[in-house]
Regions:
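Core of folded catalytic or high-affinity ligand/protein-binding domains
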Residues: 38-45, 49
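Short, Lys/Arg-rich flexible segments
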Residues: 53
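Acidic, Ser/Thr/Gly/Pro-rich intrinsically disordered interaction regions
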Residues: 1-37, 58-186
């Protein structure tokens, strides 16, 4: 079988996409974290191969791709998170507990009684007024990382678009889409 430079890149990015699917299908946070770490690995390997491919095509495109990877908050963060996972014993994600948020609507509300379980189920609730009840399940979120003595905070944007999530698989999809479009532009 003849392996082309682009087929090697496509393979790594396909494995990164599989890791995203594994995160989304994970039945526990340990499996989710493993899929996240796999994703970081495959994304970085795909980038390394893309970088070598670009070097053989256009120095201008290579320079732009490297600059974007260094200056974009999300892409830079992912690079350093992978480095931290690969070369240290520090964590790159944090487990957040589930929570239940109850807010009163216009005019407020009063709960007289009810049962709120840890899985977000609400039963036998008696209340007056307007209430909004929101359950946020236990989840993994990215965390700031220190790579080679430099702290990299949580990314706030990707390609100048604000990020409104710290959920790994949501951020992973954005970065993978960017790298795939870079490959398609070759």
């Amino acid at each position: 079988m003849n392996v082309t430079p682009t087929s090697a890149i496509i393979k790594e990015f396909a494995w990164a996409a599989e890791a995203i699917a594994e995160m989304q299908a994970a039945t526990n946070l340990e499996r989710y974290e493993k899929a996240w770490l796999d994703y970081l690995h495959y994304l970085d390997r795909g980038w390394n191969k893309l970088e070598k491919h670009l070097a053989g095509i256009s120095q201008k495109n290579l320079s732009q791709a490297r600059q974007t990877r260094k200056s974009d908050a999300l892409l830079s963060y992912l690079m350093h998170a992978r480095n931290v996972d690969e070369h240290t014993i520090r964590q790159v994600v944090v487990k957040r507990p589930g929570s239940l948020k109850i807010t009163g609507g216009p005019g407020g509300g009063t709960i007289q009684r009810g049962v709120f379980s840890g899985d977000g189920q609400v039963s036998n609730i008696v209340y007056e007024g307007a209430l909004d009840i929101e359950f946020v399940p236990e989840r993994m979120e990215i965390m700031g990382v220190t790579d080679r003595g430099v702290f990299y905070d949580l990314p706030k944007s990707h390609l100048n678009v604000p990020l409104n999530s710290l959920i790994p698989h949501e951020l992973a999809r954005l970065a993978l889409d960017h790298y795939n479009s870079s490959l398609n532009a070759c």
